[in-house]
């Protein structure tokens, strides 16, 4: 499950991530979609390319993997850590 800000969803809808993409919930602020795909490097890259415009809700293993990669990216740009 991936959650997007509602104002970004029209782009996601017109450029689907995968043929299995389905909208599962929508509220005043967000839209959640479901994909029936294998978690792989390409999916991780797609998620990371959306930056703060996407949040992985499920599976937790993917959410944790994205979190680890973002932590590593933050470390790469931390001026104190690079000393």
How would you name each of these model-derived features?
Residues 1-83:
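Polybasic (Lys/Arg-rich)
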